[in-house]
């Protein structure tokens, strides 16, 4: 197994273990995955972390939702690649279920919508046309003024 895969699995383990409420089956699945990729070895820990250093830097600013969504997307894509491996498929299912429960509020529809965005083909002219057409609304929704108005309305 490549060192990159080992590091990825280790990062997933650390993310999942950072919550004190982890279930026994989740911990067992993480340990099994870690053993499968031999992520406990020192070569998996060499150099910078894959995701955690970036995450820590974003946490200093207090705005991690965007980065969290990228990290979750990364792991879901990783699981998609690894799901056919019979030796670890059950462990991946347990971990993926945990991520869906915590990040997507246990909504498979939200997860599917989230993943569909990652699969858009940016070279497709029709996708480009629609994306540019929707861009002004997206920017408006993301602007600080828009969120400020939403907060003011919710207080009333």
UniProtKB/Swiss-Prot annotation:
<dbReference type="GO" id="GO:0048143">
    <property type="term" value="P:astrocyte activation"/>
</dbReference>
<dbReference type="GO" id="GO:0030968">
    <property type="term" value="P:endoplasmic reticulum unfolded protein response"/>
</dbReference>
<dbReference type="GO" id="GO:0031642">
    <property type="term" value="P:negative regulation of myelination"/>
</dbReference>
<dbReference type="GO" id="GO:0038096">
    <property type="term" value="P:Fc-gamma receptor signaling pathway involved in phagocytosis"/>
</dbReference>
<dbReference type="GO" id="GO:0032700">
    <property type="term" value="P:negative regulation of interleukin-17 production"/>
</dbReference>
<dbReference type="GO" id="GO:0001774">
    <property type="term" value="P:microglial cell activation"/>
</dbReference>
<dbReference type="GO" id="GO:0009897">
    <property type="term" value="C:external side of plasma membrane"/>
</dbReference>
<dbReference type="GO" id="GO:0032834">
    <property type="term" value="P:positive regulation of CD4-positive, CD25-positive, alpha-beta regulatory T cell differentiation involved in immune response"/>
</dbReference>
<dbReference type="GO" id="GO:0045429">
    <property type="term" value="P:positive regulation of nitric oxide biosynthetic process"/>
</dbReference>
<dbReference type="GO" id="GO:0071351">
    <property type="term" value="P:cellular response to interleukin-18"/>
</dbReference>
<dbReference type="GO" id="GO:0034393">
    <property type="term" value="P:positive regulation of smooth muscle cell apoptotic process"/>
</dbReference>
<dbReference type="GO" id="GO:0007259">
    <property type="term" value="P:cell surface receptor signaling pathway via JAK-STAT"/>
</dbReference>
<dbReference type="GO" id="GO:0045671">
    <property type="term" value="P:negative regulation of osteoclast differentiation"/>
</dbReference>
<dbReference type="GO" id="GO:0030593">
    <property type="term" value="P:neutrophil chemotaxis"/>
</dbReference>
<dbReference type="GO" id="GO:0060251">
    <property type="term" value="P:regulation of glial cell proliferation"/>
</dbReference>
<dbReference type="GO" id="GO:0048147">
    <property type="term" value="P:negative regulation of fibroblast proliferation"/>
</dbReference>
<dbReference type="GO" id="GO:0050776">
    <property type="term" value="P:regulation of immune response"/>
</dbReference>
<dbReference type="GO" id="GO:0030857">
    <property type="term" value="P:negative regulation of epithelial cell differentiation"/>
</dbReference>
<dbReference type="GO" id="GO:0032755">
    <property type="term" value="P:positive regulation of interleukin-6 production"/>
</dbReference>
<dbReference type="InterPro" id="IPR002069">
    <property type="entry name" value="Interferon_gamma"/>
</dbReference>
<dbReference type="GO" id="GO:0043065">
    <property type="term" value="P:positive regulation of apoptotic process"/>
</dbReference>
<dbReference type="GO" id="GO:0060907">
    <property type="term" value="P:positive regulation of macrophage cytokine production"/>
</dbReference>
<dbReference type="GO" id="GO:0050830">
    <property type="term" value="P:defense response to Gram-positive bacterium"/>
</dbReference>
<keyword id="KW-0202">Cytokine</keyword>
<dbReference type="GO" id="GO:0042742">
    <property type="term" value="P:defense response to bacterium"/>
</dbReference>
<dbReference type="GO" id="GO:1900451">
    <property type="term" value="P:positive regulation of glutamate receptor signaling pathway"/>
</dbReference>
<dbReference type="GO" id="GO:0045785">
    <property type="term" value="P:positive regulation of cell adhesion"/>
</dbReference>
<dbReference type="GO" id="GO:0150076">
    <property type="term" value="P:neuroinflammatory response"/>
</dbReference>
<dbReference type="GO" id="GO:0005125">
    <property type="term" value="F:cytokine activity"/>
</dbReference>
<dbReference type="Pfam" id="PF00714">
    <property type="entry name" value="IFN-gamma"/>
</dbReference>
<dbReference type="GO" id="GO:0045666">
    <property type="term" value="P:positive regulation of neuron differentiation"/>
</dbReference>
<dbReference type="GO" id="GO:0008285">
    <property type="term" value="P:negative regulation of cell population proliferation"/>
</dbReference>
<feature type="signal peptide">
    <location>
        <begin position="1"/>
        <end position="22"/>
    </location>
</feature>
<dbReference type="GO" id="GO:0050729">
    <property type="term" value="P:positive regulation of inflammatory response"/>
</dbReference>
<dbReference type="GO" id="GO:1901327">
    <property type="term" value="P:response to tacrolimus"/>
</dbReference>
<dbReference type="GO" id="GO:1900222">
    <property type="term" value="P:negative regulation of amyloid-beta clearance"/>
</dbReference>
<dbReference type="GO" id="GO:0038196">
    <property type="term" value="P:type III interferon-mediated signaling pathway"/>
</dbReference>
<dbReference type="GO" id="GO:0002026">
    <property type="term" value="P:regulation of the force of heart contraction"/>
</dbReference>
<dbReference type="GO" id="GO:0010628">
    <property type="term" value="P:positive regulation of gene expression"/>
</dbReference>
<dbReference type="GO" id="GO:0030225">
    <property type="term" value="P:macrophage differentiation"/>
</dbReference>
<keyword id="KW-0732">Signal</keyword>
<protein>
    <recommendedName>
        <fullName>Interferon gamma</fullName>
    </recommendedName>
</protein>
């Amino acid at each position: 197994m490549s060192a990159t895969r080992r590091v990825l699995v280790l990062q997933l383990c650390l993310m999942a273990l950072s919550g004190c409420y982890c279930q026994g089956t989740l911990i067992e699945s993480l340990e099994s995955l870690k053993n499968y990729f031999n992520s406990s070895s020192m070569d998996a820990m060499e150099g910078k972390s894959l995701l955690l250093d970036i995450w820590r830097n974003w946490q200093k600013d207090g705005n991690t939702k965007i980065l969290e969504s990228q990290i979750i997307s990364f792991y879901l894509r990783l699981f998609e690649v690894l799901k056919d491996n019979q030796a670890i498929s059950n462990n991946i299912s347990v971990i993926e279920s945990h991520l869906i429960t915590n990040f997507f509020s246990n909504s498979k529809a939200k997860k599917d919508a989230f993943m569909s965005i990652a699969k858009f083909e940016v070279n497709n002219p029709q996708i480009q046309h629609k994306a540019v057409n929707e861009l002004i609304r997206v920017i408006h929704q993301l602007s600080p003024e828009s969120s400020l108005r939403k907060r003011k309305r919710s207080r009333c």
